[in-house]
């Protein structure tokens, strides 16, 4: 009886041993799979982090303003207000204009004016001109600004903050309807497209400049430049238009806003 009982005990021991070995094998496979998965995930993550960012899109609209440092052939090196440099290229098709000193006799019927009012001028009222910028119309029409005319706009300050300084008078622009003595009548268009009439008075303190057509010979070191065009793949501006003006004490100051000339 005792010999026959020993056989089943040995059989049960063998079954338990096989089951244990199978469990250990499955556990090892699971660990191997997890390790492989972790390795794959780490590799993917590393690849994502080290991928390079795309370069800037060429042919994007751009502008460059600053002091002309040098001119070589059809390429201009410009020193910007922040002392960074920029390359501007031009061709025979580039429109070039230059602001030159002018006077009241240059203000004629049909010419286009951009007027900076003196301090204290009220919106919608006759203004006294501190500066007058003159340009010729194109097909009988004065060009529209690229952006809003400076001045006149103010934002509401946060509650409890000090009262802001009064907004500077907005620049006035339009076509000269008539000139009589020291009075200029301008016809313009407001933001809603409605026709406006503005009376502008000038005095002996009013300063005048006139935008005249220029050629490539006018592009010279020491002048201020404002150019518009598109950037090429190398980052240079391919200029479609260039505006020039004289520097003041070798400086150009901050880039002029649309409506301020230059």
UniProtKB/Swiss-Prot annotation:
Pfam families: DUF5666. InterPro entries: DUF5666. The keyword Lipoprotein applies. One of its GO terms (cellular component) is plasma membrane. The keyword Signal applies. A lipid is attached at residue 29 (S-diacylglycerol cysteine). This is 27 kDa lipoprotein antigen. It comes from Mycobacterium intracellulare. The lineage of its organism: Bacteria, Bacillati, Actinomycetota, Actinomycetes, Mycobacteriales.
């Amino acid at each position: 009886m005792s010999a026959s009982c020993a056989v089943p005990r040995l059989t049960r021991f063998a079954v338990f041993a096989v089951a244990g070995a199978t469990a250990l094998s499955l556990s090892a496979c699971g660990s191997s799979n997890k390790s492989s998965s972790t390795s794959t995930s780490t590799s993917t993550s590393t690849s994502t982090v080290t991928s390079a960012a795309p370069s800037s899109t060429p042919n994007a609209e751009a502008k460059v303003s600053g002091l002309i440092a040098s001119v070589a052939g059809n390429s201009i090196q410009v020193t910007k207000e922040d002392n960074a440099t920029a390359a501007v290229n031009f061709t025979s098709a580039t429109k070039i204009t230059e602001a030159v000193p002018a006077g009241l006799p240059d203000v004629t019927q049909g010419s286009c004016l951009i007027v900076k009012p003196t301090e204290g001028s009220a919106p919608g009222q006759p203004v006294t001109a501190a500066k007058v910028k003159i340009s010729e119309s194109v097909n009988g029409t004065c060009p529209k600004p690229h952006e809003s005319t400076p001045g006149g706009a103010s934002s509401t300050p946060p509650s409890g903050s000090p009262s802001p300084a009064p907004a500077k008078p907005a620049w006035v622009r339009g076509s000269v309807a008539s000139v009589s003595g020291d009075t200029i009548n301008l016809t313009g268009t407001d933001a809603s497209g409605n026709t406006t009439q503005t009376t502008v008075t000038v005095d002996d303190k009013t300063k005048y400049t006139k935008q005249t057509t220029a050629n490539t010979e006018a592009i010279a070191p020491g002048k201020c430049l404002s150019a518009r065009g598109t950037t090429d793949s190398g980052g240079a501006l391919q200029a479609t238009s260039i505006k020039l003006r004289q520097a003041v004490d070798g400086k150009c100051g901050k880039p002029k806003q649309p409506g301020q000339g230059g």
